[in-house]
Regions:
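Terminal targeting segments of Actinobacterial cell-envelope proteins
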Residues: 1-7
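Residue-level hotspots at or immediately adjacent to binding/recognition sites across diverse folds
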Residues: 8-330
């Protein structure tokens, strides 16, 4: 203490100032050393953009489309010598590009069953997105109908087969004519029509023939019960059953190929773009503004769907009341 005083007041202040500067500098250095090096930001990994699904709708409408049907979630169309198309309510796409010869199709819930020559039966599961092919023999299949407990198909030379949980079994004997259309109500009730104007009704005792008054080939059939049906065929032949078959004046000479019931109306379609609306004995022409052969029609709820094709040009129409939509060009 004595010695510090002897230095004088000015000297003491100078020493204190130097000490303060050193202390500040030391703190700055220490602070610089203590500050952690910033962690570099990770470089983001590049992500590939999803590849857009190709538009295969044009391929669908280049197929020889013949008919279709509707599952719970989609509309399906099949072709005779091409692939299979699917419409999800917004977009058409080629669901299966494999070449198939198919002439008829029915849908139930999420399953499509399509038929064709040489006993070919194609089962499409819309839920699992799978396709299974079965062959029922050399018989050509032309018509198919859903039953409450299975499926009924008809074909060449009077062939009738029924599918149940036990598999496929013959379901008629003594029928010789080619059968082109069938509508089934149960295992003991159905209608079928075919070549030479034949018609048969399935009853408890078996298949019973009903005279139609024509020898024209009958290719189309729609029915709501065993006592109410409409059949149509070559040369514009149109018949209505109300206890017996009665001829109706179709007003056309085109071959009529398909029929479907929507509400109280039976629609009949055929060559030359012909579409007829049959209400009882009243018949009206529906103009689709096409001359394309109409090969198949079916219902989805109250909507009528029409399928037409000529060579590699095809189209599908949807009729909702007075509104008409079309996809494709035919």
């Amino acid at each position: 203490m004595t010695r510090l005083r002897s230095l004088g007041t000015g000297t003491a202040f100078a020493i204190a100032a130097i000490a303060l500067v050193v202390a500040i500098a030391g703190g700055t250095i220490a602070g610089t050393i203590a500050r952690p090096t910033p962690t570099p930001s990770p470089t983001p990994e590049p992500t590939a953009a999803p590849t857009p699904e190709p538009d295969t709708a044009p391929l669908v409408f280049a197929l020889p489309l013949v008919t279709g049907c509707a599952t719970d979630d989609a509309v399906w169309v099949v072709s005779d010598g091409g692939g299979i198309g699917r419409f999800d309510g917004t977009t058409w796409r080629l669901a299966d590009p494999t070449l198939h010869s198919l002439v008829g199709a029915v849908c139930e819930s999420d399953v499509v069953l399509a038929i064709g020559p040489a006993g070919r039966v194609l089962t499409i599961d819309d839920r699992t997105k799978s396709i299974r092919a079965d062959d029922l023999g050399i018989v050509d299949l032309f018509g198919v109908s859903i039953l409450p407990d299975g499926v009924l198909v008809v074909g060449s030379e009077g062939a009738v087969l029924r599918q149940t949980s036990s598999g496929w079994q013959p379901y008629a004997r003594g029928l010789d004519e080619d059968l082109f259309a069938v509508v089934g109500f149960s295992g003991t009730s159905a209608w079928t029509v075919g070549s030479n104007g034949v018609s048969f009704r399935l009853e408890q005792a078996g298949w019973r023939q009903f005279a139609t008054g024509t020898t024209a080939t009958l290719r189309a059939l729609a029915a709501t019960s065993p006592t109410e049906a409409v059949a149509a065929g070559d040369g514009g032949v149109l018949l209505r059953f109300d206890g017996r078959w009665r001829p109706l004046d179709s007003g056309v000479t085109s071959d009529l190929r398909a029929a479907a019931r929507v509400g109280p109306v039976t629609y009949v379609a055929g060559d030359g773009g012909v579409l007829l609306a049959v209400r009882g004995n009243d018949i009206q022409r529906v103009d689709l503004a096409t001359t394309c052969p109409l090969r198949g029609i079916f219902a989805k709820g109250t909507d009528l769907w029409i399928v037409g094709s000529s060579g590699t040009k095809a189209a599908v129409w949807r009729r909702q009341g007075d509104k008409l939509d079309r996809w494709g060009a035919c």
